[in-house]
């Protein structure tokens, strides 16, 4: 019985550690599919489309300081030339993209 309990505990901890990594992984693929064309793979908005549209760098201090709620609203509703993604990404996908953006900002 002790062995079963230890195995269960290890599996539970493994699942808890893997869940955020999976969310970031799916956020990365959604970012690549929907955001990188303008904001670039690195978030600096140095892509041709990003430069042409004047896309804001995701590492801009104003973007870094923005709350998660504000950035979620921007992703959902669009802003300026950025299109809205509320009908194109689920809330879970938007949350994953935001987590990925926050990770990019730390690089």
Predicted regions span which residues?
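Electron-transfer interface patches adjacent to heme c in soluble/periplasmic c-type cytochromes
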Residues: 56-69, 85-94
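Post-cleavage N-terminal segment of exported redox proteins
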Residues: 1-24, 100-107
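Periplasmic/extracellular electron-transfer cofactor-ligation site
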Residues: 25-54, 79-83, 103-107
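C-terminal capping alpha-helices of c-type cytochrome domains
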Residues: 74-75, 86-107
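Short, glycine/charged-enriched secondary-structure capping and boundary segments
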Residues: 12, 51-54, 73, 97
């Amino acid at each position: 019985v002790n062995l079963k309990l230890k195995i269960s505990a290890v599996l539970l901890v493994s699942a808890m550690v893997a869940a955020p990594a999976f969310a970031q992984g799916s956020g990365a693929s959604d970012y690549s599919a929907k955001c990188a064309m303008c904001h670039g793979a690195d978030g600096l908005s140095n892509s041709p489309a990003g430069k042409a549209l004047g896309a804001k760098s995701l590492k801009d201090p104003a973007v870094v300081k923005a709350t998660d709620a504000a950035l979620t609203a921007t992703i959902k509703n669009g802003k300026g030339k950025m299109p809205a993604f509320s009908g194109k990404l689920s809330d879970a996908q938007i949350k994953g993209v935001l987590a990925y953006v926050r990770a990019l900002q730390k690089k």
